Amino acid sequence: MQKLKITGLSLIISGLLMAQRHAAEPVYPDQLRLFSLGQEVCGDKYRPITREEAQSVKSNIVNMMGQWQISGLANGWVIMGPVYNGEIKPGSASNTWCYPVNPVTGEIPTLSALDIPDGDEVDVQWRLVHDSANFIKPTSYLAHYLGYAWVGGNHSQYVGEDMDVTRDGDGWVIRGNNDGGCEGYRCGEKTAIKVSNFAYNLDPDSFKHGDVTQSDRQLVKTVVGWAINDSYTPQSAYDVTLRYDTATNWSKTNTYGLSEKVTTKNKFKWPLVGETELSIEIAANQSWASQNGGSTTTSLSQSVRPTVPARSKIPVKIELYKADISYPYEFKADVSYDLTLSGFLRWGGNAWYTHPDNRPNWNHTFVIGPYKDKASSIRYQWDKRYIPGEVKWWDWNWTIQQNGLSTMQNNLARVLRPVRAGITGDFSAESQFAGNIEIGAPVPLAADGKAPRALSARRGEQGLRLAIPLECRKSSPGLASATSA
């Protein structure tokens, strides 16, 4: 008996440890099913939900129950209907709330970007809002699934068809055609879909270029310094460093006026193309069109440690070059915008979280693009739909129950599909750059060991010094120094 008690205790401890390894998982109300198979009996691939799970989505469960209904949970618990305020307590029932053994989280898929050809701003917007398959129908079905009335024209029986697109200030309005007669309550009050507040953000990783025209490099200057050893023993304990400046002059043109609206979110370096060395940085939070050229100068250095024979000098040389390059370029700009739905909600069912039945006029704006806030983010509301009280806008669980999970996933993926516009132009630059540092052959010193017309510097007592021609010292390229190991 003692052994059995110990074994039972060990199993309990083991079970507790296993439970502690896994954090609580969300329960998505749209996947709950009520089975009338008996106390704590579920269909294939389902299990009874626990008291804790039922408590986390109690309001959702109660809204799906009859007034006097009592339904079972796992481990001898029951949940009671609206008349009982959803009380959860020990008890028994002939039916059971169940949840999939392998639930589907149902994330909204991310589709590949919809690319719009380059053009000015109005061209880009026009192409987007007039695209029936990729824009008008997905946004129309979004309004329809949320419960907006009359999302279609008088000459079609289908959602998103016979739609008119009109310019409205800096934006656009999509609304069902109202010409001719219609039948139905308030059928002349078509739901409007307004698209406005467009913004464009450059994607540096989308860079492409066309045919490259590049000149051969041309020698501009040769900088030579001398490491001089006037002692009677070889010297190699010092680095010889040649300092010089590189420069880039660049310019770009923009094919269309959309570039004036495009901004750069983060600073980035212009991509390298060909063999011409460039160092160009594009500033952040600036209009793309405002950055059409400039010049940059960078101070660099190269070092080498020569072994200088006794009573000798060794030349250390670096050559400065220039080269020209030009080519057409293309970037993509991520397009974001506001999507405002305006109309009255259907009496027969709508997804506003309070589910009003008095056909109220309702305006709501979603932001399609970077996150702004909870109220305007479809993805945030969708992902948090399992938390009662967190999403105080649309009841996405209701839309799933009415239309199906896959239908909602596919439609929202199309609504949230990234949109990109092409930004094209021509780029040209002249770059001044350096080759590699080179060490020449030793040259015996003259009897007096002097280096005419030179700036000399002795380092320590070892007899090693540097000599730099004065004409090189006067210009920014070519300063030299020696440092010990």
UniProtKB/Swiss-Prot annotation:
Transmembrane segments: none annotated. The record marks K374, E390 as: Important for heptamerization. One of its GO terms (cellular component) is host cell plasma membrane. The keyword Disulfide bond applies. The keyword Transferase does not apply. Keywords: Cytolysis, Disulfide bond, Hemolysis, Host cell membrane, Host membrane, Membrane, Secreted, Signal, Toxin, Virulence. Homodimer in solution; homoheptamer in the host membrane. After binding to GPI-anchored proteins in target membranes and proteolytic removal of the C-terminal propeptide, the protein assembles into a heptameric pre-pore complex. A further conformation change leads to insertion into the host membrane. Secreted, cytolytic toxin that forms pores in host membranes after proteolytic removal of a C-terminal propeptide, leading to destruction of the membrane permeability barrier and cell death. The pores are formed by transmembrane beta-strands and are approximately 3 nm in diameter. This is Aerolysin-5. It comes from Aeromonas hydrophila.
